[in-house]
Amino acid sequence: MQDHNKKAMAGLTLAALGVVYGDIGTSPLYTLRECFVSQNLPTTPDNIFGILSLIFWSLIFVVSVKYVAFVLRADNRGEGGIMALMALARHYTTHAARWKIVLLGLFGAALFYGDAIITPAVSVLSAAEGMEVVSSGMEAYVLPMAVGVLVGLFLLQRHGTARVGLMFGPVMMVWFAILGILGLHQIIQQPAVLQALNPWHAVTFLSQHGFHAFLTLGSVVLALTGAEALYADMGHFGKTPIRRAWFSLVLPGLGLNYFGQGALLMSNPAAIKNPFFLLAPDWALLPMIALATLATVIASQAVISGAYSLTRQAILLGYCPRLEVHHTSDKEIGQIYMPFINWALLVAVLVVVLTFKNSSSLAAAYGIAVTGTMLITTMLFFVVARVNWRWPLPLALGITLLFGVIDTAFFAANVHKVADGGWLPLVMGMAIFTLMSTWKQGRDILFKRLREQALPLDDFIHNLEAYPPARVEGTAVFLTSTLHGVPHALLHNLKHNKVLHERVVLMTVRTEDIPYVPEDERLEIVQMSASFWRVMARYGFKEEPNVVEVLDKCAKEGFEMELMDTSFFLSRETIVSTGHPGMARWRQKIFLWMSKNALRATDFFQVPTNRVVELGAQVEL
């Protein structure tokens, strides 16, 4: 049994290498180069020691301490990520504080989409730029190669990654091993580079170079891209495999490679043009470019899958309209493909690649998205530590202030890059934030209008008993979001058809602030009268609502509904924009557009289409 557990843990650790660490694992391709090039710093030993020390201790403080030691503790029943953290943070807060937490979480999620666009662009471009090291004449092929790889990657998404995903872990294990070996080879030739392990070199560099050193932090943070993935992917692998992979292979591989690049620059300052690929001997350049391209594809796949997962969570939590979701694996519920998100990402990535043309230009855009998300995570972590865990204020404030100062320094160092490309994730973030907040606000107003117009359910049932209508055989299930009002579809059915079914079931599907709902808490069945029942089905934000599955569970609870004798009634609302206060006109137009393009409720809740009756209803916004 113990051997089996060890094998399972080893398998999860290997799998985590392929998914969690792809992004941060490809950072050595461009980070050290950008630290020097962005500020035109000379490659002197003091500068090399200072920048290496900043990179190394940033990895220790931000990744090892903040994320691995602390943030991974803030799991929402095993799940991580900005949406899970937001749901956890708002769970125990007051109504006034809840909306502020939601706004923070939504903007953090919006910045992640910017990251999902920039990561494939910058990582694949940086791998393709290795061709320039092979021969200066190959420069013209860099952009076409990057575009070809990216188009191929997005075209393959619809087929799923279940099979090729099995190779991700072993490939990244080889990648980190080679990172370490290449770096160690140079360190042996220039052991003096290990002086940079002393944090005093980082302090000296910052004090001697002043404002220029501060701005260099904007490039140092590139070494931390992908740190958020440690937390976001916790639900797939668990804390222990993620921690083991980090300390056993990822951190040593990254550390050795960065120090190896520094050692190379000490012996050959001209190698700054591409210190990563120049670590490799000439005969290994082409295989190294191929491996780097594969590693960047894996890193890109991780953020693309993350974008699908985040969108699905946003839909279930009510911050995004329903979109088409395809399952690409019979075994893993998390393996999904979302056509709209896929093609939107592809178009955005290609526009970014063809606009910026090289990884150095894109590096400026990268930092804002990464540091913004890191800072928001720190803020939400404070709320969880203080409110959920009830940490004493000095402890919660002390730890989060330490992280906050580091995050703020990195973010501030990137602000000056707004004109050079930093505007890209900010514009993307604001656009996506506007869409998500508009959808949430619009749905809240819509539900409020429906509640105001709805008849009280108890009075309605009492009147039906006093003046019974004609009855027809079978069961009618009315899907409704309101608990105490009469569904519009029920009123319209009674008004136009003048009949009711023998059994009337009012079914509400609710998404909770937790990833998974225990099976014994899934259903709540209440008989309201001789012919009326209420069924409440609860799902977590990582689960998939399924109405047929709810019927099966009802049968197990003793409340049977034969599918072929059951009709499902839904309201199909036509939303009309009005001058009512509460929502700006331009937001109303956006909301109407999103509503028209949302996936039908019958498809989203997997209601059998041949058993559905839709009744129109007009609602004023």
From Swiss-Prot:
The keyword Cell inner membrane applies. One of its GO terms (cellular component) is plasma membrane. It is a multi-pass membrane protein. GO terms for molecular function: potassium ion transmembrane transporter activity; symporter activity. It comes from the Bacteria. It catalyses: K(+)(in) + H(+)(in) = K(+)(out) + H(+)(out). Signal peptide: none annotated. The chain crosses the membrane at residues 9-29, 48-68, 101-121, 136-156, 164-184, 210-230, 246-266, 275-295, 336-356, 364-384, 393-413, 418-438. It is found in: Cell inner membrane. Keywords: Cell inner membrane, Cell membrane, Ion transport, Membrane, Potassium, Potassium transport, Symport, Transmembrane, Transmembrane helix, Transport. PANTHER family: LOW AFFINITY POTASSIUM TRANSPORT SYSTEM PROTEIN KUP, OSMOTIC STRESS POTASSIUM TRANSPORTER. Transport of potassium into the cell. Likely operates as a K(+):H(+) symporter. Belongs to the HAK/KUP transporter (TC 2.A.72) family. HAMAP family: Kup. This is Probable potassium transport system protein Kup 2. The gene is kup2.
